Amino acid sequence: MEEPEMQLKGKKVTDKFTESVYVLANEPSVALYRLQEHVRRSLPELAQHKADMQRWEEQSQGAIYTVEYACSAVKNLVDSSVYFRSVEGLLKQAISIRDHMNASAQGHSPEEPPPPSSA
């Protein structure tokens, strides 16, 4: 009769031991320790990714500003085409008047200068 009783006691001891190991393995402090290990391993890589993303964001913002500025400059040039045409007309008129004055100074009688444009 000793043997079945010893087996029962041995089973109880192993069950208690297994339960103790399970409790120790899943104890909150062990879980927190494992979490801390994970964070310690992962944090440098995550910090590097964050720094990379911030740098890319700054570069993107700079590029966006440059493109917007260039678009604004092109739009302003297109809007000023009226003024360029006006200046061109005034320059042509000034050249014509100069030619007329040079011809008058040389004693020739050139045709009348064109009337000033109202551009």
Swiss-Prot record:
Where is this gene product found?
Lysosome membrane
Q: Which Pfam families match?
A: BORCS8
Q: InterPro entries from the xrefs?
A: BORCS8
Q: Which GO terms describe its cellular component?
A: BORC complex; cytoplasmic side of lysosomal membrane
- The reply to whether Membrane figures as a keyword in the UniProt entry is yes
Q: Which domain of life is it from?
A: Eukaryota
An example GO biological process term is: regulation of endosome size
Q: Which UniProt keywords apply?
A: Disease variant, Intellectual disability, Lysosome, Membrane, Neurodegeneration, Phosphoprotein
Modification sites for Phosphoserine: 109
**Assembly notes:** Component of the BLOC-one-related complex (BORC) which is composed of BLOC1S1, BLOC1S2, BORCS5, BORCS6, BORCS7, BORCS8, KXD1 and SNAPIN.
The family note in this entry says: Belongs to the BORCS8 family.
Disease per UniProt entry: Neurodegeneration, infantile-onset, with optic atrophy and brain abnormalities: An autosomal recessive, severe early-infantile disorder characterized by global developmental delay, severe to profound intellectual disability, hypotonia, limb spasticity, muscle wasting, dysmorphic facies, optic atrophy, leuko-axonopathy with hypomyelination, and neurodegenerative features with prevalent supratentorial involvement.
Q: State the protein's purpose.
A: As part of the BLOC-one-related complex (BORC), it plays a role in the movement and localization of lysosomes at the cell periphery. Associated with the cytosolic face of lysosomes, BORC recruits ARL8B to the lysosomal membrane and couples lysosomes to microtubule plus-end-directed kinesin motors, driving lysosome movement toward the cell periphery.
Q: What is this protein called?
A: BLOC-1-related complex subunit 8
**Gene behind this protein:** BORCS8
